[in-house]
């Protein structure tokens, strides 16, 4: 299971996504408009695109849990 945080930026700072493991250690940090590249760069496997679609659908400012096996 991983934890996903979607952070709303400001006028000068873009929106970001954080992906954290079960211990809430940071696994990935990338811009919200570059999800596919951010996942690849951080070696997070998303062959079916479920994680990418989940990130796009969640609102900003809350922590969400994502089970990679579902």
Segments the model singles out, each with a brief description of its role:
Residues 1-42:
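N-terminal acidic leader/helix
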Residues 34-70:
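Mixed-charge, Lys/Arg-enriched low-complexity segments
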């Amino acid at each position: 299971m991983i934890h996903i945080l979607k952070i709303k930026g400001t006028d000068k700072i873009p929106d970001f996504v954080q992906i954290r493991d079960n211990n809430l250690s940071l696994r990935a940090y990338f811009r919200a408009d570059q999800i596919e590249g951010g996942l690849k760069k951080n070696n997070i496997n998303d062959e079916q695109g479920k994680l990418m679609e989940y990130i796009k659908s969640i609102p900003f400012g809350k922590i969400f849990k994502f089970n990679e096996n579902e």
